[in-house]
Amino acid sequence: AMAVSHVIFKEFHYDHPDPYFTEYCRSPTDFPVLVMMEPREDGHFTAGRTVRACDLGYKAPECNNPEWKTVVWDELSDKPAVAQGSMGYRWGQKEGQDLGKWNLHEVDGETGKAIKPQLTFLKDSDAVIDVDYPYFGGRKRDGFPNNPMNSEVMVRKVPVGKIQVEAKDLYVATVFDLFGSYLGVDRGLGGECAKSYADNIPFTPAWQG
């Protein structure tokens, strides 16, 4: 399944983007949701939690459930937005607040403005960072083949944006960009990624085969 994901991402989201695939991933999935990148002492990063409305300054009771409303990057305004449809809009709906906002309409639920969630920072990133992912494929398990690598940590290049949270600059990545980097798809950023399907890099067809 991982190799299938690698091929689909490479061929239909990077090499030859398919409008149907792109629209589907951009609207009714969590691929555009922003994730905080947590710095490590060695200069690398790990994926932290999702960015929430409360990180943008929204507070209860003026904002209902701000800790449960996820954030995307809006292509139209070129800044973060609180897209409707996350769990924070499901509970405690009230007239004049969140009533009728638990849906996938492309609207910022807090401002009422139209938005277009951005899938990737690949073409307009503030930086490209090294992100560490755990690798478990080298461990021996009964009934399953293993494929040891040089390390149990995979380092991948990820394009990121920058936001301010409590007066601090933080790097954020979309779930889409994190997933693509995790799969080892070469998107022109360098680093440890597969140049072809024949490379023994997690998670290519050669690696899985």
What are these regions (language model features)?
Residues 1-208:
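Long, well-ordered, tryptophan-enriched scaffold segments
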